[in-house]
Amino acid sequence: MSRPIILDCDPGHDDAIALILALAHPELNPLAVTTSAGNQTPDKTLKNALRILTLLNRSDIPVAGGAVKPLSRELMIADNVHGETGLDGPALPAPSFQPQAVNAVELMAEKIRQSDKPVTLVPTGPLTNIALLLASHGELHAKIERIVLMGGAAGVGNWTPAAEFNIFVDPEAADIVFKSGIPITMCGLDVTHQAQIMDEDIERIRAIPNPVAKCVAELLDFFMIYHRAPKWGFVGAPLHDPCTIAWLLNPALFDAQDCWVGIETQSELTLGMTVVDRYQLTGKPTNATVLFGIDRQGFVDLLVDSLAVYTPTYLNRR
């Protein structure tokens, strides 16, 4: 039985790869793709989702744009990481179809309402759309099985010393999500910084004889540029967002622990910090399964094997 999911993203190189990974596996049933501002401006992230789905010949999946800014803050973007288009590197096709007339929140609500099984939400950008959905459609909470998100860190941040980018962009939205009572899997920097793709892995991907793998290799070529800065201490580039999909496909690849997680929304120094109570110091009930470790080679093998699925026959099956 396939698991119904909705991907809420801000493509973004690693968002695009997460989407490509998800659509290689029939055990995941993408009901919709929604977008928000984050890695680039809202018009660009929406276009990028359409471009990736066009590459995959999946115009059957409805797409809607969502929040153009955080709940109560000014928008910031990560164009220094993802380039002018948000997906700099490969020559992607122009979108072959249009987004839905409704916004992201209403598309998500419609798909959750219509689904005969509880839906898993997979946000890989700022949590604004998810927070708006939860705030405006309380009647649908029981139909959301889990939220598997990329964001946060138990340790250091990557946008400030304390905060990871997705949470820092809209900490008030993250606060709503983590207080919702819906089961959460948190794929934070603790695990995603271990999910590094190396030069030799990119060459494995480049050797796969299909256009989707070629596109991913070229996305990674560009993504590597930012992460080669000595300050990070990386050998490769961390594939943050695909960790969400990898966990859905094979949670045995990960080490996890149930923790209470709170979001800092006020401090000047630690705004956007995910406060992870790994040692139950607060006595508060756990609200998230936090990923701390990963089988990196197993993760890379999953990605490589998934990209090999995109043969001409697979791409033209619909």
Curated annotation (Swiss-Prot):
GO biological-process terms attached to the record: nucleobase-containing small molecule interconversion; purine nucleoside catabolic process; pyrimidine nucleobase metabolic process
A Pfam short name: IU_nuc_hydro
Record-level Gene Ontology MF annotations: purine nucleosidase activity; uridine nucleosidase activity
UniProt keywords, alphabetically: Glycosidase, Hydrolase
EC assignment: 3.2.-.-
Domain of life from the UniProt record: Bacteria
Gene3D superfamilies named in the record: Ribonucleoside hydrolase-like (3.90.245.10)
Assigned GO CC terms: cytosol
Active site annotation, chain numbering: H240
Task performed by this protein: Hydrolyzes cytidine or uridine to ribose and cytosine or uracil, respectively.
NCBIfam families: PRK10443.1
UniProt family annotation: Belongs to the IUNH family. RihA subfamily.
Name of this chain's protein: Pyrimidine-specific ribonucleoside hydrolase RihA
The species this protein was found in: Shewanella sp. (strain MR-7)
